[in-house]
C-alpha cells in the first residue's frame, strides 16, 4: 500500500547508516525548524545532528528544512482527502454543539460534546479548543473554557478536528440564545463579507503580505460602515499603527496541514495545492463580544475550493441550525 519495498528493524540502523555515510558526500539534516516554535531544550533531532557531525566531520552538511517546507506546503491528492475528512469531522462536531448550546451551559460542557463527536469519528482535537462566550472572545487564545454561557451573549467557537495526523481549523460565532441581536448581526455580516472576499482573493501568484493588506482594507471599510471608525480616524492614523488594528490585530490566515499552523514559505507566491485558513474577525471588548469566522480553502489553478462550504456560516443558517 505504501510503496515501500524494504523494511529494516531499528537495530539495523547504525550499520546501514554508516555504510551510506561512507558512500555519500552531501548530507541533508533536519532541524525541525518552524517560524512559530521557540525550542528551549535540545531535541532528539538536534542530538542526532550533533552526533553525526562529530562522527563524520568532513562531509558537506546541508539544511533540509527549506526543501521540506516547500514539499509540505503543496498538498498531494491523498493529503487533501485527509484534510477533507478532518473538515467533515469538524462539521459533525460543530453542528452537534450548535444544537446543544443554550443559556446556562458552561463552556467546558461544549468542549465535552465536541470531544465525544470527534473521537467517535476516529478524530481528535487539532488544537486546544477556544470556547469563548461574551467578552472572553476578545482574548485571541482564550482556553480556560470555564465560564457559563449567558442569554444574549455570543459564543466564539475556534474548534477543529484532526484525522490521520492532518488538521482542520474552523471558527464560528453563534448566539447563545439562538438569535442574533441587531448589533451582533451587523458585525457578523460585516465579518462574513470579509471572509467571502478573502476566500476569493486566494489566487496563485499572490503573496501573503498582499493578501493580508487586502484583508485590512476590507476590515477598514467595514469598520467605517459599523461607525467604529470615522474618515477622520483614517486620515489621522499612524501608517505603522493603523486604526483598524484596535479591532483586528492578527493575520487573516495561514497554511494548514500536518501542523495547524503548518510550515510554508510565506514570502513566496501562493501556488496550486496550498491549503490556507481564512479567518477575519472584529473584536469589540467595549461591547462585550467578538466575531471571528474561519474556513479552510484549497488553492487550485482555476480558483479556490472552500473545504468547509457545507458548514453553516450565514447568520440565518446558524439560527435555523440552533432552532432544531
Where are these regions (language model features)?
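Active-site neighborhoods and metal-handling regions in enzymes and metal-associated proteins
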Residues: 1-324
Amino acid at each position: 500500500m505504501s510503496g515501500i519495498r524494504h523494511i529494516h528493524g531499528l537495530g539495523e540502523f547504525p550499520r546501514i547508516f554508516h555504510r551510506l555515510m561512507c558512500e555519500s558526500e552531501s548530507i541533508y539534516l533536519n532541524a525541525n525548524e518552524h517560524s512559530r516554535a521557540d525550542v528551549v531544550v535540545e531535541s532528539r533531532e538536534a542530538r542526532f545532528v550533533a552526533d553525526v557531525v562529530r562522527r563524520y566531520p568532513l562531509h558537506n552538511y546541508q539544511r533540509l528544512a527549506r526543501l521540506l517546507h516547500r514539499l509540505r506546503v503543496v498538498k498531494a491528492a491523498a493529503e487533501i482527502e485527509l484534510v477533507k475528512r478532518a473538515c467533515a469531522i469538524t462539521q459533525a462536531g460543530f453542528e452537534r454543539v450548535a444544537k446543544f448550546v443554550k443559556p446556562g451551559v458552561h463552556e467546558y460542557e461544549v468542549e465535552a460534546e465536541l470531544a465525544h463527536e470527534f473521537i467517535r469519528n476516529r478524530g481528535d482535537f487539532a488544537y486546544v479548543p477556544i470556547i469563548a462566550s461574551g467578552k472572553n472572545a476578545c482574548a485571541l487564545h482564550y482556553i480556560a473554557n470555564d465560564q457559563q454561557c449567558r442569554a444574549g451573549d455570543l459564543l466564539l467557537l475556534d474548534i477543529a478536528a484532526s484525522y490521520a495526523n492532518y488538521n482542520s481549523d474552523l471558527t464560528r460565532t453563534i448566539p447563545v440564545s439562538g438569535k442574533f441581536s441587531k448589533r451582533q448581526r451587523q458585525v457578523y455580516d460585516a465579518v462574513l463579507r470579509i471572509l467571502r472576499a478573502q476566500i476569493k482573493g486566494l489566487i496563485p501568484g499572490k503573496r501573503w503580505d498582499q493578501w493580508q493588506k487586502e484583508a485590512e482594507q476590507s476590515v477598514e471599510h467595514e469598520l467605517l460602515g459599523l461607525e467604529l471608525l470615522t474618515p477622520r480616524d483614517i486620515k489621522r492614523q499612524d501608517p505603522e499603527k493603523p486604526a483598524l488594528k484596535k479591532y483586528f490585530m492578527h493575520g487573516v490566515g495561514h497554511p494548514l496541514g500536518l501542523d495547524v499552523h503548518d510550515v510554508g514559505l510565506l514570502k513566496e507566491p501562493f501556488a496550486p495545492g496550498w491549503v490556507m485558513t481564512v479567518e477575519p474577525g472584529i473584536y469589540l471588548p467595549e461591547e462585550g463580544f467578538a466575531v471571528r469566522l474561519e474556513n479552510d480553502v484549497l488553492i487550485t489553478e482555476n480558483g479556490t475550493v472552500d473545504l468547509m462550504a457545507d458548514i453553516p456560516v450565514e447568520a440565518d443558517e446558524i439560527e435555523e441550525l440552533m432552532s432544531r
